[in-house]
Amino acid sequence: RQSGSILHGDFFFRGLRTNGTNFYVNNVPGVFTQFNTPLYPIESLEVLSGPNVGIYGTGVQYETTNPGGIISVKTKVAPDERVFDYTQTVSGRGLFGEYLDYGERFGDKKEWGVRITTENLNGSTSVKGTKINGQGIFANIDHTTDHVKDNLFIGYRNLDIQGGLRWFILDSGVTKLPAVPKGSNDYSFDGMVKSTHGWLMTYNHDQEFNEHWDGFFNFGMQRNNLDRNVMANGGSGYVLKEDGTLTVTAKPGATPQEYYYWQVGTTAHYNTGDVKHDITLSYNQAWRNRKSAYNNGSLVNIGTGDLYTGIHQTLAAPTKFDTRWNNKTRIKSYSLVDYMTYEKWNAVLGVHKHEAVSNAYKYKNATSSEVTG
């Protein structure tokens, strides 16, 4: 887990940074974003590495730092015994949190389950100059019979973070690293903010036809409105000189987006001698439509600073912008894979094919044109 900032739920994976865009939630990619990831509705998180991850359903990503692996997330489901917990937390410099966790099973055979998790978070973090205001509610509803399992996960979240940027980029002329500063230093400027609200859902259907054949269907969607994003250097971080000095530049932005995904497939279970085979054939499609800011000007110099005394702001951060379509991307893929097990040995053999179309939008005189690639 990468430390230093609460803005993104970043992980380092094989030396490369990844975030929510590479998370699979209940086998559905793309419903989380690169912004701060909600953890309270998550039951487990598993890192899947290696070339075999390419045979899973393919989502539409908008981050280029794909590390050759995925983070597989399973959401909380209703346990066999009823749970009803209310928790209050205090941390940082007065960051107050409230969490509700309710789960229960219903029906003659406890075939229905409901799990609801909520968050209310407000206050200042342990990092100076960083404040959080966040609310969210997620629900997981599952239904299980002898041969069929359905699971619906749906939720809404609002999150506003003021300050918090602690990313630095070395200037091209730097030949040695600056001296290490105090970890408590504040590098926020007035008007630094990242704010988003939106909802997501996933649906999974698993069907057992007989002892040799299974079928599955996965669906997911997301509506996320990152409607305020005022960060240093357009969000990429401060550029450091060799002596630790920096220039504070900023411009406002936003990236509202919508995302859809579906996958259908079947799995066969057979043995050849002592080798067990689980052979899966699947097909999926995914769409991501994304807007970006315009009429937001270029980067504005609003002050100076350094690693040791913080930020010295001389101008107010810019705030004016509008949004319009930036790109629309669609991808479809086919996968065939054989998971083979022999005693303590495991092997994976698979083939995968995908096709993608991306339409970028150029604007001139208030009209748009598509560029397909």
Which stretches of residues belong to each language-model region?
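Hydrophobic, lipid-facing positions within transmembrane beta-strands of outer-membrane proteins
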Residues: 9, 69, 82, 96-100, ...
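Face-selective signature of the C-terminal outer-membrane beta-barrel domain
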Residues: 201-224, 246-363, 371-373
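Outer-membrane beta-barrel translocator/receptor signature
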Residues: 40-43, 52-137, 145-150, 199
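Acidic, small-polar-rich N-terminal luminal/periplasmic segments of exported/outer-membrane proteins
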Residues: 1-80
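Acidic/polar loop-and-plug regions of large Gram-negative outer-membrane beta-barrel proteins
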Residues: 125, 138-208, 223-257, 301-321
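Short sequence motifs at beta-strands and strand-loop junctions characteristic
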Residues: 5, 91-94, 129-133, 191-197, ...
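Outer-membrane beta-barrel proteins
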Residues: 75-77, 104-108, 122, 141-147, ...
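Repeated loop/turn-to-beta-strand initiation elements of outer-membrane beta-barrel proteins
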Residues: 79-83, 110-114, 147-152, 212-215, ...
